[in-house]
């Protein structure tokens, strides 16, 4: 059990504002390749109560029901713990959510997105808590999924960058990734209602959809707090692509540099990241990276589209006290100059060694190495979802009053 200590009182029955009993909320999941969709689900869940507890499944449980995870359980525990709406993390949470689990952690109800999670034998993992009326649903974030991110890594295309349209090659891959190579158990008997949810025999929950950028989403993720007197303003800059525990470890170390830190993260434009990273980087576009970083508890503010070189204007505008960089190589600006020349001149620059060796490149290498396993995992997952939808259709089609 890992407590963050940033939320409301965690004890069962503890009185919250106005003398009301604290409402404790439970979420659980794999939280593999954590992205802003996961963060948004946890944000919505936290808004339904006062204290959010998140259970994270083990590698063994995930492999049994879905297939191999990209990240280890220890990495996944740390990532969830870093999300600012999470008050407590429960490692090794059971894959099937039961009333026993909710009662053990004194939770009033659990929250899950409006998609389906199935066991290895095709059963709804939330069936028991749904029947007991201790289940709440929140909206799934459209336009981001592990499937989509894996597809971007495997195809060397820049179609996902903010200024470009999706290529036909990427769309073809996105449409076929995880699609069963054989007819699904549903065959051609899917009802029109179900068929509308899964065109082309695809599950409505496993696949790729378009993410629509809105200012409201940024507002929901942002803290909205200005630096206060006595706080130390620390500036960091980079791509923060596929926001991962390497970034979290770095930001956590930066956060420790001051008694009252106010950390500002400057995110570079997609084209700038591609200049110094090459290939098809960044994997996530600027808007997606912004939401991912805003969800981190160690970050107070984000500069969207920050200049590559840290300028005097930027330092003066934000009244920056300290500028930090990790142990990754510092690539010169387009004109060959040092991007940290100004903070170095002022004597406010320092490099941080977080102790983590994980990089975005290493994550992509993991995916490419295990490509066939991940594709097989999605094929298996989608086949189960389609079978579940067909079972629902048959149940709805059964004449009322008919018994087995």
Curated annotation (Swiss-Prot):
**Source organism of this protein record:** Rattus norvegicus
This protein's gene is called Pcyt2
**Pathway in which this enzyme or protein is active:** Phospholipid metabolism; phosphatidylethanolamine biosynthesis; phosphatidylethanolamine from ethanolamine: step 2/3
Q: One biological process GO term for this chain?
A: phosphatidylethanolamine biosynthetic process
What PANTHER family does the annotation carry? ETHANOLAMINE-PHOSPHATE CYTIDYLYLTRANSFERASE (PTHR45780:SF2)
Q: Which reaction does it catalyse?
A: phosphoethanolamine + CTP + H(+) = CDP-ethanolamine + diphosphate
Give the Pfam families listed for this entry: CTP_transf_like (PF01467)
* UniProt keywords, alphabetically: Lipid biosynthesis, Lipid metabolism, Nucleotidyltransferase, Phospholipid biosynthesis, Phospholipid metabolism, Phosphoprotein, Transferase
What are the GO MF terms of this UniProt record?
A: ethanolamine-phosphate cytidylyltransferase activity
- Locate the Phosphoserine modifications and list their residues: 356
The GO cellular component terms are: cytoplasm
Function of the molecule: Ethanolamine-phosphate cytidylyltransferase that catalyzes the second step in the synthesis of phosphatidylethanolamine (PE) from ethanolamine via the CDP-ethanolamine pathway. Phosphatidylethanolamine is a dominant inner-leaflet phospholipid in cell membranes, where it plays a role in membrane function by structurally stabilizing membrane-anchored proteins, and participates in important cellular processes such as cell division, cell fusion, blood coagulation, and apoptosis.
The family note in this entry says: Belongs to the cytidylyltransferase family.
What name goes with this protein?
Ethanolamine-phosphate cytidylyltransferase
Phosphothreonine-modified residues are where? 359-360
Record EC number: 2.7.7.14
């Amino acid at each position: 059990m890992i407590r963050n200590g940033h939320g409301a009182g965690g004890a069962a029955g503890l009185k919250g504002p106005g003398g009301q009993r604290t409402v404790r909320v439970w979420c659980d999941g794999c939280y593999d390749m954590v992205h802003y969709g996961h963060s948004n689900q946890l944000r919505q869940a936290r808004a339904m109560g006062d204290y959010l507890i998140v259970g994270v499944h083990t590698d063994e449980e995930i492999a049994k029901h879905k297939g191999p995870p990209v990240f280890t359980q220890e990495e996944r525990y740390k990532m969830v713990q870093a999300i600012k709406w999470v008050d407590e993390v429960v490692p090794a949470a059971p894959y099937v959510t039961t009333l026993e689990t909710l009662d053990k952690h004194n939770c009033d109800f659990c929250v899950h997105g409006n998609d389906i999670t199935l066991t290895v034998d095709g059963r709804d993992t939330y069936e028991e808590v749904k029947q007991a009326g201790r289940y709440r649903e929140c909206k799934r974030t459209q336009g981001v999924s592990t499937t989509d991110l894996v597809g971007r890594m495997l195809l060397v295309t820049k179609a996902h960058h903010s200024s470009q349209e999706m290529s036909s090659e990427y769309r073809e891959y996105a449409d076929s990734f995880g699609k069963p190579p054989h007819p699904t158990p549903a065959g051609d008997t899917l009802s029109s209602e179900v068929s509308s949810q899964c065109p082309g025999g695809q599950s409505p929950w496993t696949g790729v959809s378009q993410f629509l950028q809105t200012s409201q989403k940024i507002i929901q993720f942002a803290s909205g707090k200005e630096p206060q007197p006595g706080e130390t303003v620390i500036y960091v800059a980079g791509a923060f692509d596929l926001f991962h525990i390497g970034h979290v470890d770095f930001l956590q170390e930066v956060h420790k540099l001051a008694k009252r830190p106010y950390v500002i993260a400057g995110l570079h434009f997609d084209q700038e990241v591609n200049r110094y990273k090459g290939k098809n980087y960044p994997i996530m576009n600027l808007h997606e990276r912004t939401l991912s970083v805003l969800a981190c508890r160690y970050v107070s503010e984000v500069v969207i589209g920050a200049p590559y070189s840290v300028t005097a204007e930027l330092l003066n505008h934000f009244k920056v006290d300290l500028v930090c960089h990790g142990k990754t190589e510092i690539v010169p600006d387009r004109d060959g100059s040092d991007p940290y020349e100004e903070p170095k001149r002022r004597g406010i620059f320092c490099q941080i060694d977080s102790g983590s060796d994980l990089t975005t490149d290493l994550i992509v290498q993991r995916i490419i190495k295990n490509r066939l396993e991940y594709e097989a995992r999605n094929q298996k997952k989608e086949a189960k979802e389609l079978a579940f939808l067909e079972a629902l259709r048959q149940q709805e089609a059964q004449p009322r009053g008919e018994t087995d």
